Amino acid sequence: MSRRGTAEEKTAKSDPIYRNRLVNMLINRILKHGKKSLAYQILYRAMKKIQQKTETNPLSVLRQAIRRVTPDIAVKARRASGSTHPVPIEIGSTQGRALAIRWLLGASRKRPGRNMAFKLSSELVDATKGRGGAIRKREETHRMAEANRAFAHFR
């Protein structure tokens, strides 16, 4: 029996402008080499570009993009009877949101374009419309899970 106390679950802080935890999670994933002010700059410029492109609330666009990209199921490698099988596993909301943010940023970094703010805004707008690299990644993950449904009993 462990003598350690249970770790307190940390809640994500909200950012200063939008007062939203989701925005802060995104900023922390954009962050590179400890340059948080640059991460704030990138995201706020992207939000401004979204406002100009769609003429709607950029926060709702961000929420919708993340909701569209969030996977329901993923594939995890499990070792059973001497061989490794890809086993489909359901994903919780927190982990799904984290994956969605990671995929959105990965897809926007791969995009051709001028700067990160422009690429991120384009990716978020595309994700709300059901296209883009992050949506492709989600569909690919769901396809993999569907193809390996036979191994679902290995959970």
From Swiss-Prot:
Pfam families: Ribosomal_S7. InterPro entries: Ribosomal_uS7, Ribosomal_uS7_bac/org-type, Ribosomal_uS7_CS, Ribosomal_uS7_dom, Ribosomal_uS7_dom_sf. It comes from the Eukaryota. Keywords: Chloroplast, Plastid, Ribonucleoprotein, Ribosomal protein, RNA-binding, rRNA-binding. GO terms for molecular function: rRNA binding; structural constituent of ribosome. The keyword Secreted does not apply. Gene3D superfamilies: Ribosomal protein S7 domain (1.10.455.10). GO terms for cellular component: chloroplast; small ribosomal subunit. One of its GO terms (biological process) is translation. It is found in: Plastid, Chloroplast. One of the primary rRNA binding proteins, it binds directly to 16S rRNA where it nucleates assembly of the head domain of the 30S subunit. Part of the 30S ribosomal subunit. NCBIfam families: rpsG_bact (TIGR01029). Belongs to the universal ribosomal protein uS7 family. PANTHER family: RIBOSOMAL PROTEIN S7. This is Small ribosomal subunit protein uS7cz/uS7cy.
